[in-house]
Amino acid sequence: MRKAKPKKRVILPDPVFNDQKVSKFVNHLMYDGKKNASYEIFYAALETVKAKLPNEEKSALEIWKKALDNVTPQVEVKSRRVGGATFQVPTEIRPDRKESVSMKNLILFARKRGGKSMADKLAAEIMDAFNEQGGAYKRKEDMHRMAEANRAFAHFRF
């Protein structure tokens, strides 16, 4: 066991929207310390989203936040050994982990899309998530389905 819980680092808000969530997302998107490239990709993706959904009364940032909410899981399954058998125990997810998992899934499935630039792939995944479709949304649904199927083992909580 560790002595003390590590302090949470303060993440500075992004320069355009002044939002910490955007900064966190860009940090997940970043490769090799290239944060400016990540910001460019993210902002280009939001521009594309706004261009593709012109009749939507929400701003591109609000669409992105709604898409994130749509792919945020509420429960997950964790493996737990009990008497030689391994059970998939459904557990609720901490709020900070919910946010992190949803961002990582959105980025992962955007990267898996074929062809085009990363900005286009991210924009497509954001629009799919906004419309409750796409890989990231499917991953959330699968997590919930697994938790529901293993509900009988919920009394093995950690």
From Swiss-Prot:
CDD domains: uS7_Bacteria. The keyword Ribosomal protein applies. InterPro entries: Ribosomal_uS7, Ribosomal_uS7_bac/org-type, Ribosomal_uS7_dom, Ribosomal_uS7_dom_sf. One of its GO terms (molecular function) is tRNA binding. GO terms for cellular component: cytosolic small ribosomal subunit; ribosome. Keywords: Ribonucleoprotein, Ribosomal protein, RNA-binding, rRNA-binding, tRNA-binding. Signal peptide: none annotated. It comes from the Bacteria. GO terms for biological process: ribosomal small subunit assembly; translation. The keyword Disulfide bond does not apply. Belongs to the universal ribosomal protein uS7 family. Part of the 30S ribosomal subunit. Contacts proteins S9 and S11. One of the primary rRNA binding proteins, it binds directly to 16S rRNA where it nucleates assembly of the head domain of the 30S subunit. Is located at the subunit interface close to the decoding center, probably blocks exit of the E-site tRNA. This is Small ribosomal subunit protein uS7. It comes from Bacteroides thetaiotaomicron (strain ATCC 29148 / DSM 2079 / JCM 5827 / CCUG 10774 / NCTC 10582 / VPI-5482 / E50).
